[in-house]
Amino acid sequence: MLKLIIPTTMLLPLTWLSKKHMIWINTTTHSLIISPIPLLFFNQANNNLFTYSLSFSSDPLTTPLLMLTTWLLPLMIMASQHHLSNEPPLRKKLYLSMLIILQVSLIMTFTATELMMFYVLFETTLIPTLVIITRWGNQPERLNAGSYFLFYTLVGSLPLLIALIHTHNTLGSLNIMLLTLSSQNLTDSWSNNLMWLAYMMAFMVKMPLYGLHLWLPKAHVEAPIAGSMVLAAVLLKLGGYGMMRLTLILSPLTKHMAYPFLMLSLWGMIMTSSICLRQTDLKSLIAYSSVSHMALVITAILIQTPWSFTGATVLMIAHGLTSSLLFCLANSNYERTHSRIMILSRGLQALLPLMAFWWLAASLANLALPPTINLLGELFVLMASFSWANTTITLTGLNVLITALYSLYMFIMTQRGTLTHHIKNMKPSLTRENMLMLMHLFPLLLLTLNPNIITGFTP
């Protein structure tokens, strides 16, 4: 595990010791060299738990998320270059340091084998993200967004800490493998139900569940490009990862405790998709679409079947790449038009034809067009929820329809139509930007050829 953590940590001295004209080149190339390391963890006999030490281990659920995390750092660095072009070298280095610290804490969170260590690292990821949003965001509202993000996450996580201390007092251990393999036989009592709620609430806020999602659109809209990318692609997946780990430990309870949350996430999925159709702000639309996709993942995890777990894992990876790509595209528009309002940036296909192709590809991936892995994940979840209760097909089917509507609405509003009068001249798309979009789409297309490496705990 250290072969991943140590090189990533060593990016910090690399950043601070680089000359000012070499900062971007050094960090991008070295983080790209580090990114294939998790591919080595895929090569495991019979999908077992691969333990490196007492503290860290990886398994078929962790490894795809590690791959996503490491792949995203060079992309975030590439995307941030224009945003930081007027900053002094010291601030550039500070910004990159925040991204690297966030990367290290995410890697350690995904691989932690001890629940208290997982909790501490889970909370650690909050600090660099908060600094990135509140220091480098564009509008003054970023402070409000930062406080929403901080307090929602903290209030959601405190009950988890109390539940962990309680579990440690009663069982004497918080080792994830030990707790998963030993049968708990939790009875249906008030105290156990409250403990289940305390365990799940932190992750439901992080996912976010509909009703606890108000911090997400604010944080996404006000964050700089790298903040939006890492929030959408990896930080939301922390919630899904935690839920998958802990619902297995609390297994008999989840059966009946899940009902209200299943109903809420299925309903929230429709509501947030419908909200997307009314958005004028491009980043806000993509943020609400993230809430809608994550509601599908919550549904899958709470159904508790091997198929639904597979679907949740695939959907998390697919959504991570797709939403990050959409935020990059929205940012490239914002850098040229200085506005996130879709009506003010219409007709851009005439000026940036190659960018229009990336927009089309991203919109189609977002609406889960075959043969993307987004479709694979959605099909797994749809089939699992249909076999759990036939009536869910009306809600999930409606959601698929609305997703297609708002994805195409987003594409048509930004790319088609007549150009607005205030756009007289516009910079052409840079090679860096095209490369960035390609590096998002490339893994999506490659995973289409071999999706079984990201199917997680296959039955």
From Swiss-Prot:
GO molecular function: NADH dehydrogenase (ubiquinone) activity; ubiquinone binding
Disulfide linkage: none
Entry's Gene Ontology BP terms: electron transport coupled proton transport; mitochondrial electron transport, NADH to ubiquinone; mitochondrial respiratory chain complex I assembly
Taxonomic superkingdom: Eukaryota
Residue ranges crossing the lipid bilayer per the database entry: 22-42, 60-80, 98-118, 145-165, 196-216, 224-244, 257-277, 284-303, 307-329, 350-370, 393-413, 435-455
Catalytic activity: a ubiquinone + NADH + 5 H(+)(in) = a ubiquinol + NAD(+) + 4 H(+)(out)
Subunit relationships: Core subunit of respiratory chain NADH dehydrogenase (Complex I) which is composed of 45 different subunits.
Family designation: Belongs to the complex I subunit 4 family.
Protein's UniProt name: NADH-ubiquinone oxidoreductase chain 4
